[in-house]
C-alpha cells in the first residue's frame, strides 16, 4: 500500500513487504480435561497471593512526539494510577528532531513540545472523574512539574546538557532504590546524556564504583526500536551492565502493522469500535486520541503522514474512517501493570507487553515465541497480539471513567486470587488442585477460565527436533520471528479438568524434572457492559 512505502518514516515505513507475509492472528489457546489420582499441593512459603503488598513500578517516559507516541501518552494517563510516574521527558529520534538554526540543522517531522502541556490540561479536566473510579491518579500539577524537555535538536544529539538530561540524572542518582523503568519511545540520546553527565562527574572519584553499582541495579531501559545511535555508541559501551528490554519487532503489531492481522486479533482496532468506545463522547482527553480520517492535523508532521485527513484515507484505501492508527510504544508501560500475570517478575513470563527471551544477564529481546492456534505455528508477535481484546476492553472501560461522575456509572475489573498460593512445588505425577476466588466491585457475574501458558514453562512437552526459526524483515527492520511445527510436535500435553470453573485440576507430567516450571493462568471475567478481566498466574 502507499501507506507502507515511505522508507524513511518511523513505524509506518518498510512495511509494504508485509503484504505477502503470513502474520499471526488469534487469542487464547484452550485447555482440555483429564483425570488423575489426587494428592495434596505443597505450597512453598507463605500464601503470597494474599500476603505480599506489591509496590507500584516506578517509571519515566521519554518520547519524540510522533502521533503514536501521543496516543500512547493518552492511554498511559488512564493507567497512571497503576504505576509511579517519575517524569515525562521530550527527546528526539532519527525520525523526529527540532533542528538547530545556529548549527544549520533543519527540523524534521518535529511536532513541538506544546502537545504534552495540552494533553496534561485535558487530563486535568477528566482527573476528578478518574479519581472517582480508582485511587492513585497523579495530580495534574504534579505531572506538569515532572515534564521536561531533553535533547531534541538532532538525531542522537547528546552533547548538550539539557533540562531533561539533568532531570534523568537526578532520578538515576536519587535515594529511591526501586527499579526505574525508562520507557524509550524515541531515541536514547537524552538518557545517554544523563549517564554521560554522571560519568563525567564521578569517574575520577572514589565514588565511581559505588555509583556504577547504583545505576546498574536501578535503571532498566525499555527500548522500543533503536531510534538513534546513542545506545550502541555510548550506553552499551560505557554502561554495559544496565539492564535492557529491547522490543525490536513485537511492538510493530500494536503499531502500523496491525492491519495485517485478522479479526481474531484486531476486531477491537477497527474504526466503528474505536470511535464509539474510545473517541466519541469520552471527554476532552480522548477527543485528542488520533484515529484514521478523524480530521486531526499535526503541525510539523509531513503531509503524507497526516493520517487524520481525507487525502490520507483516499490514498490509503485499506483503512476505514476512525480505524486505529498506532500505539507502538504502549507495550512498554502495559508490561508494568500489575494485572496478575506477573510479567514484571521476569521478562520471559509474558503479559500485556509481550514476552522476551534472555540474550545475556542484562539483555532481553523478542526471541520467545508463542503458539498461535489460528496459524498453527509459533510466532514472537503472538505473545503480544494474543492480549489485544483484553487490552482494548480495559482501555474502553477507563475511557468511560473519564465521563462517569459516579462509580455506579461505569464498569471496573474484578480481582482474583488463588487459594493455594501462586508459587507451588510438586512431584512428577502428582495431581494439583487450584481454587480461584474472584470478586467484582460492581457485583457483576464472574466466569472463570484456566489455561496453561505452556510457552512460558521450562518444562518441555515436545523433546524431538524442532524446526528452525525464520525471521521476517521489511528492509532492515525485523517484523516477526516464526517457527513452523515439526511433524508430530506436541504443543500442550497437560490436560486441565474444570477449566471453566473456579477449581481446576491437572497432573504434573511423569517426566517432569526437578526445577521444571509449569505456568497456569486463571482469568476472571465479568459480565459488565464491557467484559473486563483480571488474571492470576500460578507457577
Predicted regions, residues:
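Short beta-strand segments within Ig-like beta-sandwich modules, predominantly Fibronectin type-III
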Residues: 495-500
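C-terminal motif of bacterial Sec signal peptides marking the signal peptidase cleavage site
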Residues: 27-30
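Hydrophobic beta-strand segments within extracellular beta-sandwich modules
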Residues: 518-520
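Bacterial N-terminal signal peptides that target proteins for export
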Residues: 5-18
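Short, solvent-exposed loop/turn segments at the edges of extracellular beta-sandwich modules
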Residues: 525-531
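Short, surface-exposed loop/turn segments at beta-strand-coil junctions that are enriched for proline
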Residues: 505-514, 527
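N-terminal acidic, glycine/proline-rich low-complexity segments
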Residues: 37-435, 439-471, 478-480, 484-492
Amino acid at each position: 500500500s502507499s501507506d507502507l512505502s515511505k522508507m524513511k518514516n518511523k513505524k509506518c515505513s518498510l512495511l509494504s513487504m508485509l503484504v505477502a507475509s503470513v502474520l499471526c492472528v488469534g487469542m487464547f489457546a484452550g485447555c482440555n480435561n483429564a483425570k488423575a489420582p489426587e494428592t495434596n499441593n505443597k505450597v512453598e512459603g507463605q500464601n503470597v497471593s494474599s500476603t505480599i503488598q506489591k509496590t507500584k513500578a516506578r517509571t519515566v517516559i521519554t518520547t519524540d512526539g510522533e502521533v503514536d507516541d501521543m496516543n500512547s501518552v493518552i492511554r498511559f494517563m488512564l493507567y497512571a494510577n497503576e504505576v509511579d510516574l517519575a517524569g515525562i521527558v521530550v527527546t528526539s529520534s532519527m525520525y523526529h528532531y527540532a533542528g538547530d538554526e545556529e548549527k544549520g540543522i533543519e527540523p524534521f517531522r518535529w511536532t513541538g513540545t506544546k502537545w504534552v502541556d495540552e494533553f496534561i490540561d485535558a487530563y486535568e479536566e477528566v482527573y476528578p472523574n478518574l479519581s472517582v473510579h480508582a485511587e492513585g491518579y497523579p495530580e495534574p500539577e504534579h505531572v506538569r512539574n515532572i515534564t521536561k524537555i531533553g535533547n531534541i535538536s538532532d538525531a542522537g544529539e547528546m552533547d548538550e546538557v539539557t533540562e531533561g538530561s539533568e532531570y534523568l540524572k537526578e532520578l538515576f542518582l536519587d535515594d529511591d532504590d526501586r527499579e526505574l523503568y525508562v520507557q524509550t519511545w524515541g531515541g536514547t540520546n537524552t538518557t545517554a546524556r544523563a549517564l554521560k553527565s554522571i560519568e563525567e562527574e564521578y569517574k575520577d572519584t572514589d565514588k565511581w564504583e559505588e555509583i556504577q553499582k547504583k545505576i546498574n541495579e536501578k535503571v532498566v531501559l525499555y527500548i522500543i526500536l533503536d531510534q538513534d545511535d546513542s545506545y550502541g555508541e555510548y550506553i552499551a559501551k560505557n554502561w554495559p551492565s544496565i539492564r535492557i528490554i529491547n522490543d525490536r519487532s513485537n511492538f510493530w503489531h500494536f503499531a502500523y502493522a496491525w492491519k495485517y492481522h485478522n479479526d481474531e486479533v484486531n476486531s477491537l482496532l477497527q474504526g466503528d469500535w474505536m470511535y464509539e468506545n474510545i473517541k466519541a463522547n469520552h471527554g476532552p482527553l480522548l477527543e485528542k486520541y488520533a484515529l484514521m480520517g478523524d480530521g486531526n492535523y499535526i503541525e510539523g508532521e509531513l503531509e503524507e503522514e497526516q493520517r487524520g485527513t481525507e487525502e490520507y484515507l483516499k490514498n490509503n484505501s485499506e483503512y476505514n474512517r476512525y480505524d486505529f492508527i498506532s500505539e507502538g510504544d504502549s507495550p512498554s508501560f502495559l508490561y508494568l501493570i500489575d494485572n496478575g500475570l506477573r510479567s514484571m517478575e521476569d521478562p520471559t513470563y509474558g503479559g500485556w507487553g509481550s514476552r522476551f527471551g534472555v540474550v545475556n544477564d542484562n539483555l532481553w529481546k523478542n526471541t520467545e515465541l508463542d503458539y498461535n492456534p489460528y496459524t498453527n505455528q509459533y510466532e514472537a508477535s503472538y505473545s503480544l497480539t494474543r492480549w489485544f481484546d483484553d487490552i482494548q476492553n480495559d482501555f474502553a472501560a477507563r475511557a468511560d471513567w473519564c465521563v462517569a461522575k459516579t462509580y455506579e456509572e461505569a464498569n471496573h475489573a474484578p480481582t482474583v486470587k488463588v487459594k493455594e498460593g501462586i508459587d507451588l512445588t510438586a512431584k512428577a505425577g502428582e495431581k494439583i488442585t487450584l481454587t480461584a476466588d474472584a470478586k467484582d466491585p460492581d457485583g457483576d457475574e464472574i466466569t472463570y477460565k484456566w489455561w496453561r501458558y505452556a510457552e512460558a514453562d521450562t518444562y518441555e512437552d515436545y523433546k524431538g527436533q524442532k524446526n528452525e526459526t525464520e525471521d521476517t524483515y521489511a528492509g532492515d527492520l525485523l517484523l516477526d520471528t516464526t517457527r513452523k511445527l515439526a511433524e508430530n510436535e506436541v504443543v500442550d500435553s497437560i490436560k486441565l479438568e474444570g477449566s471453566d470453573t473456579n477449581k481446576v485440576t491437572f497432573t504434573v507430567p511423569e517426566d517432569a524434572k526437578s526445577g521444571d516450571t509449569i505456568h497456569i493462568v486463571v482469568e476472571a471475567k465479568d459480565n459488565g457492559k464491557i467484559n473486563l478481566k483480571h488474571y492470576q498466574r500460578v507457577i
